[in-house]
Amino acid sequence: MIDFISRHIRFIFLVCLVFMINACQEDPARHLNLGNWYLQRGLLDEAIMEYREVSRLYSGDQSQLKRDEFQVLGKAHLKLAIAYTKKGWWEYALSEAKRSFDISPDKDCHELIVLIEEKLSQDTKG
């Protein structure tokens, strides 16, 4: 009887451990959505932290990412570029916009790159 109870206690402990590990895993899409929420409210530093966290979570072998994960990563870099422009950090913004374009080339990324490059060239002239 004691052996039976001991096995059940170990089983329950292992199940709890698995649930705790799964609960602690990070969800990049959740960080992207939270960053978007912060950005909409003008909380730029918080938004930047969330977008950078998405990048950190996907910092491993990107050849193993699924299509939707590439989209999340690309959007995080694009939104990070936008947040940097709002802070006036144009060089960082350009770097992130280019990174976003490399991951997920689209019209929005390209247009943002062009706008940032124009802003930087105006700043050097003026």
Where are the predicted features?
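Bacterial Sec signal peptide processing site at the extreme N-terminus
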Residues: 23-40
